Amino acid sequence: MSRKKLTDIMICGFALFAIFFGAGNLIFPPYLGVISGSNWGIANIAFLLSDPLLPILGVIVTALLGGQATDLGKRVSKHFSIIIGAISIILIGPLFAVPRTGATTHEIFVQSFVPTAPQWITSLIFFGLTLYIAIHSHTVIDAIGKYLTPILLIILLLVFIAAVVQPNAGFQTTTSAGLFSQSFKEGYQTMDALGAALMAGVVISDLTRRGYTEKKEQYQMMFGVGIVSFILLALVYSSLTYAGATVSTVYDSTVQRPALLIELIEQLLGSFGKVAMGIAVSFACLTTSVGLITTCGHYFSTLTNGKLEYKKIVVVSVVLSFLLSLLGVDALLQLAVPVLSAIYPMVIALIFLSIFDRYIVYNWTYTGAVVGAFFIGGIQAIHLFSQMQGGNFLAELATWTNTLPLHQFGFEWLVPSIIGSVVFTVISKFTGMGSKRV
């Protein structure tokens, strides 16, 4: 491999790392470390499979399919790809991810120094800035982002070193039962896999700009870029999981994730580290918020051929994000669980099938896989929503899903997805229903 290719792979790999390295994601690994204690390695591996492996695979396969946001689900149907794309954008936009950036800023930074400060004031300022920048000036965010990522990485490196050199307490002895599944599904909360299809176009455009115009060459570069990004993200998340495990005798599963992160930083790096981390995370959350809001605006404006104006979409998205942020981080995470339980299995099935897309003849192979995955995910989602309302709807079916193979790993939907894929393939082959690969 030439020096130029290696350099470009490193640059693009760091760029993809920066895209997925959202400050809001930092709250998850330390919490996993706390609940896993002595078994933090199992929790860490499960989380890394969910994020960053899935999102990076999503970027790579979408690039292989054509690089458009709607390519991932297009072999199910054009309408399905649009719907799943729109749902993903809404979830990583004004429904969950963006409100969480505002709530995280309040709980990690503002509340740490002014405990009595009301959430609505923080959110009003935060989303006021988001609205202004999203409409008027992206250069501010570019400038902030240029310096924020290195600062955050330096702080996190110091956290890991401090955790290794002077652990605060020790590892709580825990059971590994159900830990892999819980940790894997904790990775759903980052929602990075939902935005992976959008990121593929960004990477492809960057590679094209650098002179890699041949498809085969782009694919080779994409694999290298993905590996670099994965290694960087894995190092960051693993460090935080380990740091969380070192205080697993101090905290338990009831600790709030943002509070845990900032308290961990203070214990390991002192007051200066706490202030530096709070400021860095707040600005990083702002850049994430602006980026996701503008992406949402452009996506729906393009999807409707300009019938929905970019500015109007941005305003509505920001207002909705402001209102939902008032619920707080933990409430937003709880609300997201049922929705992600329904959506994520379908996305994972699409990503893995797309790896072998060139060998899959029948489009119904994809349809069957999605139907099987959604059947299980849908049952669990409805049951979880019911439990949140004090009910127990579909309890027997939900209990049945827990008896399915691979449930202990969080893949109880996999066998039904495979069965659905095989059945739909056979039907398509012998009846001629559905389309074939062109």
Task: Pin down the residues of each PLM region.
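Membrane-water interface regions at transmembrane-helix termini and the short interhelical loops
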Residues: 64-72, 127-148, 209-212, 322-335, ...
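Hydrophobic alpha-helical segments and their helix-loop junctions in multi-pass secondary transporters
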Residues: 94, 98, 153-176, 193-196, ...
